[in-house]
């Protein structure tokens, strides 16, 4: 018994008799409010515990020989698909080789609605050719005229595109397609006239070599000339069909470099740029940071995040001495790699947080209750003393 008596001396929570306890309305209100606060903070702490914690790390990127996937969805409301070409080049200006792509062009009307039910697949570095005749009726070994634009290495023009390229190599303006047999049978003028008031949506993906480079959307047909990438803007063609200015207004619905991961923000998504003048050149300078995202279940996502700076200027589309009109995305790769690792939050931290919430709210509520109780008693005593005198 003496041991138990000594043990009672360490009780930090002495009890009072029920008869000496006073319950008040103020105390009840404080209890209810503090209970609600505890409940809200508890669920907040629980929600925080159930979310995954992401730890960032920084490494030197040692990967070699990888491919870079570029996801594209861009709308050009005032540039017909027949005039628009898409190309990818490396940092040296050479056209990218071994590029896997799945790009489509969707013709749009003035309200940005599809003109046709199906989009046309785009070939990099090539212009689309809508064949309206049966090619079996033509001699496969034929050599048709280039109408004075023949050269030693380009002596036969068996299609309208061949004639146009021969003219470009000579530096001649291609003004009268209706006088050229190849263009007449392929319906070149009808195709251009049909699309002159349309827009174009380009969507799909590119997989290029993981080196600095660019991809761009520009009017005209592209080709390699003396190892230099050339865009023939064909201002004379555009004027002849009513497009006397090149309007490169565009809306970037989506642009990313790789797969999405939780929390990723693509800074160009939803960007809408209006060309205030004709023949504008828009350049997006992109810095790509290789990124690895490791999920809790061990799944590893190898992707990229990027930052971007935009520059625009007016060009002379006819001469091209100030650049060419179009939208150019010039990207370079960071030598550093970011790694994000998902982890579950510690259960002991959760328990510590819950105890802190309960203890803190309980203590503060006790102080508030005591303040209310003793303040009320002091006021009541003053009132009673006033009545007595």
Curated annotation (Swiss-Prot):
Membrane-spanning intervals of the chain: 26-46, 348-368
Keywords: Endoplasmic reticulum, ER-Golgi transport, Golgi apparatus, Membrane, Transmembrane, Transmembrane helix, Transport
Keyword Magnesium: no
Family of this protein: Belongs to the ERGIC family.
Protein name per its UniProtKB record: Endoplasmic reticulum-Golgi intermediate compartment protein 3
Keyword check for Membrane: yes
UniProt subcellular location: Endoplasmic reticulum-Golgi intermediate compartment membrane; Golgi apparatus, cis-Golgi network membrane; Endoplasmic reticulum membrane
Topological domains, Lumenal: 47-347
One Gene Ontology term from the biological process aspect of the record: retrograde vesicle-mediated transport, Golgi to endoplasmic reticulum
Residue numbers on the Cytoplasmic membrane side: 1-25, 369-389
Annotated function: Possible role in transport between endoplasmic reticulum and Golgi.
GO cellular component: COPII-coated ER to Golgi transport vesicle; endoplasmic reticulum; endoplasmic reticulum membrane; endoplasmic reticulum-Golgi intermediate compartment membrane; Golgi membrane
Family annotation (PANTHER family): ENDOPLASMIC RETICULUM-GOLGI INTERMEDIATE COMPARTMENT PROTEIN, ENDOPLASMIC RETICULUM-GOLGI INTERMEDIATE COMPARTMENT PROTEIN 3
Main location: endoplasmic reticulum
Its membrane topology: Multi-pass membrane protein
